[in-house]
Amino acid sequence: MSKRDFYEVLGVDRSADEREIKKAYRKLAMKYHPDRNSDDPDAEEKFKEASMAYEVLSDKEKRSAYDRMGHAAFENGMGGGGFGGAGAGNFQDIFGDIFGNFGDIFGQSRGGGGRQRRGSDLRYVIELSLEEAVRGCKKEISFTAPAPCETCDGKGAKNASDIQTCSTCGGHGQVRMQQGFFAVQQTCPNCGGSGQEIKNPCNDCHGTGVKDKSRTLEVSIPAGVDDGDRVRLAGEGEAGGAGVQNGDLYVEVRVKEHPVFKRQGADLYMDVPVSITDAALGKEVEIPTLDGKVKIKVAEGTQSGKLLRVRGKGVTPVRTTMKGDLICRIMVETPVNLTREQKDLLRQFQDTLDGDSKHHQSPKKKSFFEKLGDLFD
């Protein structure tokens, strides 16, 4: 049994109330539950340690004894008198009090007196264009995963009469391991949590009830999904085997880069190139949107980097009704590959600007040199 202070194990003060103790245990149970940490051999021990601490500190009588005597309170008569009756209680009841009916948060479902395993969840990454993600679509996906054996219909046995209640766990799927004063439940080593024994296994799947199979599914992608969103297909994951629930399939969305638009939440962004003359004189410019072409007004004297908002031309994110906007960034283009005549005309035009500085025809330039003057005065 763990010799660490139980309050330290749960990370609570000695004055913590019942609510604080339950909250601390829930956090640790979520973090270290063996079903979520199959690749971490230390997680199960930490989970047991937290469970032991909670079993004592959540019970007023046990907590009082622990506060007076520490671990010594439970080192004598652990299996019989004293606190023996309470200590022999079902650990599953403790866990159920904390998590209610949310056993499948650990990839398992609760059934009968114990908790049965379920097949593993699967992940499939699907690439969509921006248009497909915004409007929604249907996609076919193909993958190979464990599926119910067709020979035995997923039962794992040649005949239904060959399936019997597990003699080790009595059909509960779990066995209780006594650790001194505490009782901790673990998956039954005989039936693997299914609660059943197969006396005459199927020759094709060797009693597992599953075989790898290539599958093709049609997935409905809802309108408005974004990069990283997931679509859950319940029961379409890995087959759990004989008497065990299937896992789920999670289709993860990857939105391909668009040549024109970039998405940020509900809004779309795009760069709109305009010539120097159009920016200086103003012009109505036609731009693309996901709903078709629209015109925007580039006002006279518009500077490069100016943002113009087109209302309602963005995206309606999934599970919302509010549509975003299209944000247009004006990019004033400097002409290149000018002829000699064009260069001369531009110099003449520049001379007219230099001679009429009182009208501030280059506001950014004026502001820049004013700041320089303030800096070096």
Curated annotation (Swiss-Prot):
Residues 367-377 have a biased composition (Basic and acidic residues). A zinc finger (CR-type) spans 136-214. One of its GO terms (molecular function) is zinc ion binding. Zn(2+) 1 binds at residues 149, 152, 202, 205. The keyword Signal does not apply. Residues 353-377 are annotated as: Disordered. PROSITE patterns: DNAJ_1 (PS00636), DNAJ_2 (PS50076), ZF_CR (PS51188). It comes from the Bacteria. Its cofactor is Zn(2+). Transmembrane segments: none annotated. It is found in: Cytoplasm. Keywords: Chaperone, Cytoplasm, DNA replication, Metal-binding, Repeat, Stress response, Zinc, Zinc-finger. The keyword Cell wall biogenesis/degradation does not apply. Residues 5-70 form the J domain. SMART domains: DnaJ (SM00271). NCBIfam families: DnaJ_bact (TIGR02349), PRK10767.1 (NF008035). Belongs to the DnaJ family. Homodimer. PANTHER family: CHAPERONE PROTEIN DNAJ, DNAJ HOMOLOG 1, MITOCHONDRIAL-RELATED. Participates actively in the response to hyperosmotic and heat shock by preventing the aggregation of stress-denatured proteins and by disaggregating proteins, also in an autonomous, DnaK-independent fashion. Unfolded proteins bind initially to DnaJ; upon interaction with the DnaJ-bound protein, DnaK hydrolyzes its bound ATP, resulting in the formation of a stable complex. GrpE releases ADP from DnaK; ATP binding to DnaK triggers the release of the substrate protein, thus completing the reaction cycle. The J domain is necessary and sufficient to stimulate DnaK ATPase activity. Zinc center 1 plays an important role in the autonomous, DnaK-independent chaperone activity of DnaJ. Zinc center 2 is essential for interaction with DnaK and for DnaJ activity. This is Chaperone protein DnaJ. It comes from Psychrobacter sp. (strain PRwf-1). The lineage of its organism: Bacteria, Pseudomonadati, Pseudomonadota, Gammaproteobacteria, Moraxellales.
